[in-house]
Amino acid sequence: AWINHINSGTAFPKANVNKHFWKSDMMTQHGENFYMSAKIISKRTYGTESLNNENIKGYNLPLGATNIMTTGKEYDNIYPVWDWTRIPGTTAIGNQDKTSLEGYQIGNNEFGGGVSDGVNGIIAYKGKYNELQANKAYFFFDNMMFCIGSDISYVQNDNVLTSVEQNLLNGEVIYNDGQEKQLSSNSNMQLKQLKWVYHNNT
């Protein structure tokens, strides 16, 4: 269904389907014209790998990375300019040196896993990587994903960043900080009372 959707725009079945891939610590949710996923790590899995000088900045990929897609093209051509400290769904250290990966990343946390009834699901983990402690949980309901973090702590001076999404600009960016507004072109903004952002169908 996903290949047909990418190639010809064929709609997904209207029913939502949730799947927990327990051998790889991953959960997917898809329905008509959307796909979402979350990837975690545990002692049962290799989170990611860097071999043949590839994926050398992929350390954060298994630490709660999410994908949110409605067209399948959301991340096309982004990787040359991708900020590897801000992988969607992750809570990570804002230092490019902390993204470096060599060989296999083996999970060290006991608590990690998920549960699915085939329609909705939850996946979560509790871990400490690069001295950053975080509890992360991802709840999938219908066409929504709720990402929850707690007990986040880090003793060094680098910023700790929780990222919701990162893709190339495609159309208007609408946000609400008490009032609904449109982000102007070529702007860089920090908001303290942000309620929501809408861009690229999400």
Which role does the model predict for each range below?
Residues A1-T202:
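Extended polysaccharide-engagement surfaces of secreted carbohydrate-active enzymes
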